[in-house]
Design a protein with these regions (language model features):
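Non-catalytic N-terminal regions of enzymes
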Residues: 1-143
């Protein structure tokens, strides 16, 4: 068990209702540059699963102290379901930049489940009509 840092505790304390204190990143990837020229969702799941074993932050979840007498603690969750945390979705048609931004905004507006490790990743396909993006590319949105 480890106490939340002051910054982590601050983010948690000021989060209320629609004011979510989440940090996120969005990357766009061309799977043709992967070894073999393709990348399957199962390979991405395997990658995250291997990183979960090496990186404690992917396994930590919150435990509150009764009556709020102290800052919450991080505990190591040994039973993290990678398929809960890494999700596979596709953009609705036409699959353009606007649709990608709408989807990312929707995902970002959802609170993380505080009973699980505090992260989610989304593989977003269907970017074929985003100008300047190679057809068949996908986005990785992680928060």
């Amino acid at each position: 068990m480890k106490h939340l840092s002051g910054l982590d505790n601050l983010f948690l304390a000021v989060e209320h209702g629609n004011q979510l204190m989440q940090v996120a990143a969005l990357g766009i990837y061309d799977p043709s540059t992967a070894p073999g020229g393709e990348l399957r969702f199962k390979s991405i799941l395997n990658f995250f699963e291997s990183r979960m074993k090496q990186t404690p932050v992917f396994r930590r979840r919150l435990i509150a102290v009764p009556w709020g007498l102290d800052r919450p603690y991080w505990i190591d969750d040994t039973d993290v379901d990678v398929e809960y945390h890494v999700r596979h979705i596709a953009l609705p048609q036409p699959g353009d930049w606007r649709q990608l931004m709408i989807q990312v905004a929707r995902l970002h507006s959802r609170s993380l489940d505080k009973s699980k490790p505090l992260w989610e990743a989304y593989i977003i396909e269907g970017l074929d009509h985003v100008p300047g993006i190679v057809p068949g590319s996908f986005a990785l949105y992680i928060k």
